[in-house]
Amino acid sequence: VDRVETLHPDRMLYVVDQRQALHFEQVFRAADMAGLMSEDRLEHIGFGTVNGTDGKPFKTREGGVLRLADLNRMALEEAEKRIGETGLSGDIGEEERARIAALVARAALRFADLQNVRTTNYVFDLERFTSFEGKTGPYLLYASVRIKSLLRRAKDAGHAPGQIRIESETERALVLALDGFANALEQSHAKRQPHILCEHVYTLAQAFSALYAAHPIANESDEALRTSRLGLCEAVLSQLEAG
């Protein structure tokens, strides 16, 4: 009542556990009947539970609710372990390693939570979430870092992105993936389903990886092809960062 009278919202969205769906259905109906706000302006954005390997809602060892700070700490520890496994830790300083670990941990948790259909439950698996392979946040992060490095090296060599032309099936697949961004963004918003956008950026990263494996990019001797592929890389990076 206070929010309606004080804020005068056009729409109110309640992002709460899907198990509360019946409760909100009743609350919204009561609010409509009381003349506070019509039901079509009230929406429950339900989400599934984060479960342990036993299939039950994830909790601390003591049985309490796990706080976000605890999740961040756990993800950071796993990310640091992952970086150590890559052999990267020996090439960078302690401060840079900590910065990269924080980025990896954040990407892992965010993507893991948003990639699922919002109302479904999922198992909390940090080993999988922090992997640099597969459908994970670190995989997308790695693709972005690789593109930035590629564009930077091209710039240092005097090469710039240019007009895009399609000369192969891998390039065609990448262009088609890029073309889906606007629709993915629109559908993700309209349906209140972030996983749609997550699916798009993952597909895009896969398409870029296929291009990277199939063709030279910065080292392409044909100038038109080189500038085209650099242009594709620039477009991919833009969508990965926006997504």
Which role does the model predict for each range below?
Residues 1-243:
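Non-catalytic interaction-recognition regions
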